[in-house]
Amino acid sequence: MLLKAETEIGEYETAEELFDRLAVIGGDLLLKTIDGLEKGSITPTPQNDEEHTYAPMISRETGVIDWSKSAPEISKLICGMNSWPLACTKYKDGILKIVSARVCDENSDKEAGEILALEKGKGLKISCGEGTLYIVTAQFPNSKKMNVEDYARGHEIELGVVLGKE
């Protein structure tokens, strides 16, 4: 290892946004590395094999939401699957792809995955295994990606439907 950089990942930063940010950080780091190698000011350091991690290949199945998980876990999955393959869940007879969501500070005693409400300025409120989540932007079956409030202006969103159910 020649040089390294560290960066925080924002709470709702998507994989695509992080990729773009890391490209800039990586470019700057590459220039510093080349400069340091030319000046002889960089000493290679062996990587600690005990600290390495394995990242499996991402498939469409990776993005399928398990609503029994906590709202923060589901939110992180949604961010991590944006822009491909997008987090998704069964919705009525189709697939709902979720582009963005926000964790809600409320709990629910309803079934995990149940659509609880459509709240103005917040989104579609969903019960999770622990906590609740607002779906903000989504792609409903046979539709394009859009804010869920905009979608609801022209389509009925039935409360009480449980997402992820066959």
Tell me the role of every PLM-derived stretch.
Residues 1-104, 121:
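Active-site-proximal loop/hinge segments within enzyme catalytic domains
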Residues 68-166:
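An anion-binding loop in the catalytic cleft
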